[in-house]
């Protein structure tokens, strides 16, 4: 562990360079790393944690029962996603919060000095964020298909992961990483609260679940429904035109403009779909006098749970 800390400390994370295609090999590395890490955590951490949190100190528990195993698996999924979303949110904030584009969207496309897109260099820590997140969502396509509990929004999840991977790869290659890093920071923050709420619900801590679901709904609405379209998409639709030389690179410029905005708007449509589900849950919470009911995204009865 000390050796890893020493290596990390010796790396110049502020070093800048242009993105290169061969950098994407690290995306594939993380795509292979995440399932291995999840398997280890599932077996040696999350399984025991789930049993302790759900069943307490009971020594005899029929975990072979369908409902008991189903609840354990759901807890483990949420624990894994909590670990990822918390880590990537902290990484995204550490990468972006001190950069000028974190507060001024004009710097998505220009600066420092006279440098403008597409000649924007990337710091090594920004490249790390991109490979880390890209690897996770690439792995998540297969995890959603073959590993995790299949829920009501299964198709939306697959579309989301494919769209996100496409955005990450294309924005990295074509120099849109500054705005991409802020998109990652906006997206993963609310999911931290959601996974805490779900783990609390599975564990029977209803008050904690109610509090964190309320926080999740508030953060989701603020970041994905308000900030995302009026900050991110506004910049890609309007401010990008100031630096995108369509006359010089007519074909490439038009393709970049419409492809990126189409993918970003696709994410917004998914946000609105999930926002509708959240509103339904808020309504149920109000009708049940402050307590959240079962997740309306829970698995359909016709689908089998994953087996560990």
UniProtKB/Swiss-Prot annotation:
Membrane topology, from the record: Multi-pass membrane protein
**What the protein does?**
Mediates resistance to sphinganine-analog mycotoxins (SAMs) by restoring the sphingolipid biosynthesis. Could salvage the transport of GPI-anchored proteins from the endoplasmic reticulum to the Golgi apparatus in ceramides-depleted cells after SAM exposure.
PROSITE patterns, per database record? TLC
Provide a GO biological process annotation.
ceramide biosynthetic process
In terms of PANTHER family, this protein maps to: ALTERNARIA STEM CANKER RESISTANCE PROTEIN 1 (PTHR12560:SF38), LONGEVITY ASSURANCE FACTOR 1 LAG1 (PTHR12560)
Q: Which gene encodes it?
A: Asc-1
Q: Name one GO molecular function term.
A: sphingosine N-acyltransferase activity
- The entry's protein name is Alternaria stem canker resistance protein 1
- The record places domain TLC at 73-287
Q: Where in the cell is it found?
A: Endoplasmic reticulum membrane
